[in-house]
Amino acid sequence: MTQDELKKAAALAALDYVEDGMIVGVGTGSTVNHFIDGLAGIKHRIRGAVSSSEASSKRLAAHGIALLDLNDVDELPVYIDGADEIDHGFAMIKGGGGALTREKIVAAVARRFVCICDESKRVDVLGRFPLPIEVIPMARSQVMRAAAALGATPRLREGFVTDNGNLIIDLHGLSITDPCATEQALNAVVGVVTNGLFAARGADTLLLASAQGVRRFERSAT
């Protein structure tokens, strides 16, 4: 199977978590695109979706799936999204597509976070994939200096502006052995909106696709 076929398999498996009358939180990225396409087939069963990006909103709307504003929703039963990396503690690096802030906001509201990805995204230690941070434009240089002091090699994502009008700096060369501490340290830097570590709010369920099929893992309660 190709990587895209594996992504599709994981995405379609997530449809099992969509129940009648539900409002579904929807992430961003190539794997989530497959989920949105699958969701279109059962759109008559759900109330609608809360989207984490303009790109996902456009795809949902193209399928005729009702879009709801997060501010009008008290709670989301489930949030479906991919990951650039996920470790064995269910902490993730996300935001390769630049939607990390809205993804983190929607995930925070959801009761269950279902991560969908292929087996290449499962890692022992996070950091091989560059860690994105969303930055207020006037703080770019200050944040890059602070990131370098933490041991990263920061690189501005040239020509990219987030849906919120901010910049993305990608941090290379990190070996993230304590994702929660790193997430907190980066968020404490003045000018950082948020970073792509999802550790304080990691995934609850992982649907991991391989040539042998889609396996389900649940985060330990301990």
UniProtKB/Swiss-Prot annotation:
It catalyses: aldehydo-D-ribose 5-phosphate = D-ribulose 5-phosphate. GO terms for molecular function: ribose-5-phosphate isomerase activity. Its EC number is 5.3.1.6. InterPro entries: NagB/RpiA_transferase-like (IPR037171), Ribose5P_isomerase_typA_subgr (IPR020672), Ribose5P_isomerase_type_A (IPR004788). The keyword Flavoprotein does not apply. Substrate binds at residues 28-31, 81-84, 94-97, 121. Keywords: Isomerase. One of its GO terms (cellular component) is cytosol. Pathway: Carbohydrate degradation; pentose phosphate pathway; D-ribose 5-phosphate from D-ribulose 5-phosphate (non-oxidative stage): step 1/1. Catalyzes the reversible conversion of ribose-5-phosphate to ribulose 5-phosphate. Homodimer. This is Ribose-5-phosphate isomerase A. It comes from Azoarcus sp. (strain BH72).
